[in-house]
Swiss-Prot record:
<dbReference type="InterPro" id="IPR028888">
    <property type="entry name" value="MOCS2B_euk"/>
</dbReference>
<keyword id="KW-0808">Transferase</keyword>
<dbReference type="GO" id="GO:0030366">
    <property type="term" value="F:molybdopterin synthase activity"/>
</dbReference>
<comment type="subunit">
    <text>Heterotetramer; composed of 2 small (MOCS2A) and 2 large (MOCS2B) subunits.</text>
</comment>
<feature type="binding site">
    <location>
        <position position="159"/>
    </location>
    <ligand>
        <name>substrate</name>
    </ligand>
</feature>
<dbReference type="GO" id="GO:1990140">
    <property type="term" value="C:molybdopterin synthase complex"/>
</dbReference>
<feature type="binding site">
    <location>
        <begin position="166"/>
        <end position="168"/>
    </location>
    <ligand>
        <name>substrate</name>
    </ligand>
</feature>
<feature type="binding site">
    <location>
        <begin position="143"/>
        <end position="144"/>
    </location>
    <ligand>
        <name>substrate</name>
    </ligand>
</feature>
<dbReference type="GO" id="GO:0006777">
    <property type="term" value="P:Mo-molybdopterin cofactor biosynthetic process"/>
</dbReference>
<dbReference type="InterPro" id="IPR036563">
    <property type="entry name" value="MoaE_sf"/>
</dbReference>
<feature type="region of interest" description="Disordered">
    <location>
        <begin position="176"/>
        <end position="198"/>
    </location>
</feature>
<dbReference type="InterPro" id="IPR003448">
    <property type="entry name" value="Mopterin_biosynth_MoaE"/>
</dbReference>
<feature type="region of interest" description="Disordered">
    <location>
        <begin position="1"/>
        <end position="40"/>
    </location>
</feature>
<dbReference type="Pfam" id="PF02391">
    <property type="entry name" value="MoaE"/>
</dbReference>
<protein>
    <recommendedName>
        <fullName>Molybdopterin synthase catalytic subunit</fullName>
        <ecNumber>2.8.1.12</ecNumber>
    </recommendedName>
</protein>
<feature type="compositionally biased region" description="Low complexity">
    <location>
        <begin position="1"/>
        <end position="27"/>
    </location>
</feature>
<comment type="similarity">
    <text>Belongs to the MoaE family. MOCS2B subfamily.</text>
</comment>
Length: 198
């Protein structure tokens, strides 16, 4: 993950950045140039980066297949606290060409490894309020075991590899850029706990 994320606009649902403000933004930071999508018909893969709210039903529609006996859907949502601090919202940014390339690699490898009928990954950018989804992962497979394992692996690969930067914004006015890492019930990074034991 890059050490310093690119700066981004923080559009809200109630206001739209002015045309003159957007004209000065590079295209990858301009919300009006989204959604950015990438598909691979070979493996029934659909990938999306968007500033709009995510649609879980759309994810299941994309992964639907007559050969699928199992569909797994994961929604990652913004929670209201982090390490005891009240969170007001999250904000995400990325460089789409690189992010879509990484997502395609993750989805293609999972489709081949788990013999998936479909893979859908959508990541929201910009401001994501409390209780709204920042990521949707859906997979379909012939049987539930493959679908469960594939869904989890796709999510963990996205968290580990995707070039998306997350800014946690707090009610007290503070903010922190964070890496997407797996945390335990106390909020501690799981990888760090494993390293401490070794």
């Amino acid at each position: 993950m890059a050490s310093q994320p690119p700066q981004e606009p923080t559009p809200t649902a109630t206001s739209t950045p002015s045309t003159s403000a957007l004209a000065s933004l590079p295209p990858h930071l301009d919300p009006t140039t989204y959604p950015r999508t990438l598909t691979s018909p070979t493996h029934n893969i659909h990938l999306e980066l968007t500033y709009s709210p995510l649609n879980p039903s759309q994810a299941l529609t994309h992964t639907s297949s007559p050969a699928a006996g199992a569909n797994v859907l994961f929604l990652g949502t913004t929670r209201d606290t982090f390490e005891g601090r009240a969170v007001s919202q999250l904000s995400y940014t990325c460089y789409p060409p690189l992010a879509l390339k990484t997502l395609l690699d993750i989805a293609t490898k999972a489709a081949e490894k788990f013999r998936l009928e479909g893979v859908y990954i959508a990541h929201r950018l910009g401001v994501v309020p409390i209780q709204e989804s920042s990521i949707v992962v859906a997979v379909s497979a012939g049987h539930r075991g493959m679908a469960w394992r594939a869904g989890e692996e796709v999510l963990e690969e996205v968290k580990a590899r995707l070039e998306v930067w997350k800014r946690e914004e707090f009610v007290d006015g503070g903010m922190e850029w964070r890496e997407n890492r797996e945390r335990d019930a106390e909020g501690k990074v799981v990888a760090e706990k494993q390293e401490e034991r070794e």
